[in-house]
């Protein structure tokens, strides 16, 4: 499968999906009447199931992202989710800021972003149905990965100018179990 690649420019925003090309990227995959999950939703209500650690957001749940995904598994959503979103904090500093906002003490293991991402991806994966899509956002293209049976179908770079890192938006499709 050929990977669709594009690049846009837009000013950065703390609310990732408010950046027009990024919001458009999400809406492209967010079809009506599908089951969608966002473990790091903040105030976005575009998705069927939303979560954010911060209780001052509009998310439906306020759990650790891994725990949220496991709650949905227990509710019978294994293999039923059409669209998963991975828009977690991009850096250890951002993780620390999120924890501090809610008065949670931050330990070194909490800011090991690769461990957080792996735990959440491992918990999100069983929810995604075959041919379901996961959209990942950040500063790399690690995504769900081939070991979990995913194939990259689209990458969009969004340049923010100056000394800002680009936001990398990636869509992956879940193939049959390897």
Language-model segments: which ranges?
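Class I S-adenosyl-L-methionine
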Residues: 143-178
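S-adenosyl-L-methionine
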Residues: 1-51, 57, 163-170, 178
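Short, well-ordered beta-to-alpha junction loops that form the rim of enzyme active sites
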Residues: 40-42, 137-141
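Short glycine-rich, flexible loops that bind phosphorylated cofactors or substrates
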Residues: 92-94, 143
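Soluble or luminal CAZymes and related metallo-dependent hydrolases
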Residues: 14-22, 64, 112-120
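Short glycine-dipeptide loop
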Residues: 33, 128-134
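Adenosine-cofactor binding site in Rossmann-like domains, unifying the SAM/SAH pocket
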Residues: 14-17, 40-78, 83-85, 90-92
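A short glycine-rich, Lys/Arg-flanked "PGG" loop and its adjoining helix->strand segment in the class I
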Residues: 100-130
């Amino acid at each position: 499968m050929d990977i669709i690649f594009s690049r846009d420019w837009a000013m950065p925003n703390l609310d990732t999906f408010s950046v027009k090309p990024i919001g458009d990227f999400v809406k492209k995959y967010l079809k009506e009447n599908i089951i969608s999950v966002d473990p790091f939703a903040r105030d976005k209500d575009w998705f069927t199931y939303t979560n954010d650690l911060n209780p001052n957001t509009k998310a439906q749940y306020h759990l650790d992202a891994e725990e949220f995904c496991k709650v949905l598994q227990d509710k019978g959503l294994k293999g039923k989710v059409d669209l998963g979103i991975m828009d977690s904090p991009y850096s250890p500093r951002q993780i620390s800021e999120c924890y501090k906002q809610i008065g949670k003490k931050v330990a070194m293991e909490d800011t090991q972003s690769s461990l957080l991402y792996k735990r959440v991806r491992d918990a999100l994966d069983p929810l995604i149905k075959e041919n379901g899509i996961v959209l990942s956002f950040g500063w790399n293209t690690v995504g769900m990965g081939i070991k979990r049976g995913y194939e990259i179908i689209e990458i969009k770079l969004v340049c923010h100018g100056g000394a800002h890192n680009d936001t990398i938006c990636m869509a992956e499709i879940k193939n049959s179990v390897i």
